[in-house]
Amino acid sequence: EQPIATLSEATLRQSISVVPQRVHLFSATLRDNLLLAAPHAGDDALAAMLCRVGLDKLLEDDGLNAWLGEGGRQLSGGELRRLAIARALLHDAPLMLLDEPTEGLDATTESQMLELISDVMRNKTVLMVTHRLRGLSRFDQIIVMDNGQIIEQGNHADLLARQGRYYQFKQRL
């Protein structure tokens, strides 16, 4: 283990997968949009990941050669979000940072994506920022913040038992 400040940019990029709140779609092929995260991935791995995130319909016409973005197929917000999750999972880093990864997804798709992330990232570190409480029982540690301050932390069961802010949020659902 070494301090993060001593790591090179290349090492940091290799070590971290990110699902940003604002996902960028490049005007390029579907393949190119995925290879950004995993440059050496084969077509089978790319197609399999698209299927895992529920985007297999993107493969129907031109497959991985389908043009996305300007001059090509536009993606809905939910499709864009799932493409970002596919990129992050393909990157296969030991640390994943997620910023509102399921924003705009319906409840069923949100549950599927959180289950997939949990499965693929087993024994790895996931840091997720969210305002939604669905799926948090899968996490080992939950930190509840208010105005930039930590007000509670623990696992799902502990936080419910304390009947604090997390419990109050859950009661409102």
Predicted regions and their residues:
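Conserved "ABC signature" C-loop
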Residues: 23-67, 116, 165-168
